[in-house]
Amino acid sequence: LRTLAQVRGVPGRLEPFGGHRAPWVVVDAAHTPQALTRVLVDLRTHARGRLICVFGCAGDRDAGHRPQMGAVAERLADQVLLTDDNPRREAGEAIIAQILSGMRQPARAVIEPRRGLAIRRAIATAGRDDLVLVAGRGHATRQDRGDHQVHFSDRAQVQQALAERRGAHFLEVAA
């Protein structure tokens, strides 16, 4: 991952953040069962600790993928945090329920509909050797909610959460 961090790739595609006293965090646009499988299998080879997956599924899109995505994440990640993606005109809770329906042990999934908080939680609770995948939105910078769009960037949220974590760590060390 250190080498990957030095390469300028496509924003939102296996894009690494963190490292150096913080967990590695990877943002990827994986939004199908096949893409999520591929990225989790690839990242597993780099995870020295837990592999944590934060994702949701888009609204008004292929609902049949949702249970499959839940099954993939449960099988390949050590911890799963389910959240909103782009709910569009669908209820986020209904989308998450469909994802959970594909899991054998849905009670083990952490549910935080507010995507920014889900990202922060995953990064705040990850150990230095853990690897966090934030999947589904990649480089997107807006979220569709009903009839309106709001600015939202996984990449910016990850950077902010890592900065907050570094600040909290600095305060703990300085105290």
Each model region followed by its residue ranges:
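ATP-dependent carboxylate-amine ligase
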Residues: R2-A175
